[in-house]
């Protein structure tokens, strides 16, 4: 659909801080996996921190990204020759030169991500009913998101993608900060 073309074009050309609000059923995680694969096709050294509301949902996009790379005609031979090292929580694309920081690190928003480095921090549906039940829970989520500042290298991009679930949504706050 045309809306997906608009989304991938926007993902490529957006600014360093961005927020993509999508309705349920949009396919945002699938679009994000395709975008991630394209980023790795462009640069084997690109590093993504992908965070979801919990580990297992973050791992889905990590696995989807790897599957796109393994199946796409432009990357499947490259992936088969080099064999991406790692597992769903973190892995390196063939040809990545940073041995310490993986190409893809996937984790839940409350997981420990310290000592990592990334060129892009993705927050995919981190705001869900379970973690916004009260002001304290929402503040904890915002605190954990603030840790990304210490992981993102200078010039890194930060993306928030999801569907708002509360009147004082994280996505509203990100847009007030000047996000694309």
Please annotate each region the language model reported:
Residues 1-180:
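Short, flexible loop motifs at catalytic/binding sites
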């Amino acid at each position: 659909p045309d809306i997906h073309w608009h989304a991938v074009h926007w993902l490529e050309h957006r600014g360093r801080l961005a927020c993509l609000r999508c309705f349920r059923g949009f396919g945002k995680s699938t679009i994000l996996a395709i975008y991630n694969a394209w980023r790795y096709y462009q640069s084997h050294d690109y590093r993504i921190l992908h965070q979801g509301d919990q580990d297992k949902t973050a791992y889905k996009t990590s696995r989807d990204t790897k599957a796109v790379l393994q199946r796409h005609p432009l990357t499947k031979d490259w992936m088969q020759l080099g064999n991406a090292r790692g597992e769903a929580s973190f892995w390196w694309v063939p040809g990545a030169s940073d041995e310490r920081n993986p190409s893809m690190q996937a984790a839940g928003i409350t997981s420990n991500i310290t000592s990592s480095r990334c060129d892009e921090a993705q927050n995919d549906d981190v705001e869900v009913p379970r973690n916004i039940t009260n002001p304290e829970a929402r503040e904890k989520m915002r605190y954990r998101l603030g840790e990304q500042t210490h992981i993102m290298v200078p010039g890194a991009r930060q993306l928030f993608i999801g569907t708002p679930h509360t009147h004082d949504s994280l996505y509203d706050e990100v847009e007030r900060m000047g996000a694309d």
